[in-house]
């Protein structure tokens, strides 16, 4: 029997230590120990091994956080970064290249505007804005080089709402990634992937 996302999130927990803690502790460590130098060498040499080597790459506390959020968002997997803005910037830089075009809602967080208008142009990535109250105009902005459509819904701070299924239809028609900042709604209220989003971004300083 399949479990609801909420049940999966509750059941996901890092392997208990010999201290038999009830909740996952904070693993405040940069590195990890090994039984031998040979074991350490294998861990560093083989990326396929499911073992912690350095907290910048993986950490039990962070791993559980990722798994729980992914379960709540009905997502395949996730990545945790230091801040919400670093998550947004990392997403842009992962999926966009020189010459690409991104369509974005104009009603977005101020720092995201800064990335779109000041940083991405340095790498030859251009953007177009659309009005969330006039979604019928979005498709006219699509170009051959358009690779992504980005939106916050509800937007920060204006709480503008848009139909994600409508956006998903446009993106699938033109083979564009639909990226949704869901930090104001959280997966408790809205799960964008269920409505066709490809990627979901969060800031953990809002309601999570």
Where are these regions (language model features)?
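Generic structural signal for well-ordered, non-membrane alpha-helical segments
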Residues: 3, 21, 58-62, 109, ...
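N-terminal start-of-chain detector that recognizes signal peptides
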Residues: 1-2, 50-53, 60, 74-75, ...
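N-terminal "arm"/small-domain region of PLP-dependent enzymes with the aminotransferase-like
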Residues: 1-59, 67
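A generic structural signal for short, solvent-exposed coil/turn residues
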Residues: 1-2, 20, 46, 72, ...
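Short, basic and Ser/Thr-rich N-terminal targeting/leader segments
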Residues: 21-22, 74, 89, 123
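Conserved PLP-enzyme active-site core in the AAT-like
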Residues: 9-14, 79-208
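Conserved N-terminal alpha-helix of the aminotransferase class I/II PLP-enzyme fold
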Residues: 36-86, 111-118
């Amino acid at each position: 029997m399949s479990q609801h996302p909420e049940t999966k999130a509750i059941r996901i927990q890092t392997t208990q230590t010999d201290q038999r803690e009830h909740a996952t502790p904070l693993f405040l460590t940069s590195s990890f120990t090994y039984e031998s130098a040979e074991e350490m060498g294998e861990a560093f040499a083989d990326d396929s091994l499911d073992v912690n080597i350095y907290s910048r790459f993986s950490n039990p506390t962070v791993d559980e956080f990722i798994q729980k959020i992914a379960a709540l968002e009905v997502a395949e997997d996730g990545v945790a970064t230091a801040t919400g803005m670093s998550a947004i910037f990392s997403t842009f830089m992962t999926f966009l290249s020189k010459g690409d075009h991104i369509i974005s809602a104009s009603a977005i967080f101020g720092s995201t505007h800064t990335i779109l208008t000041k940083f991405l142009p340095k790498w030859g990535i251009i953007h177009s804005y659309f009005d969330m109250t006039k979604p019928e105009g979005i498709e006219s902005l699509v170009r051959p080089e358009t690779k992504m459509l980005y939106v916050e819904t509800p937007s920060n701070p204006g709480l503008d709402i848009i139909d994600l299924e409508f956006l998903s239809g446009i993106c699938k028609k033109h083979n564009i990634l639909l990226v949704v900042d869901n930090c104001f709604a959280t997966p408790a209220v809205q799960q964008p992937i269920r409505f066709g989003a490809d990627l979901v971004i969060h800031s953990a300083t809002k309601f999570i």
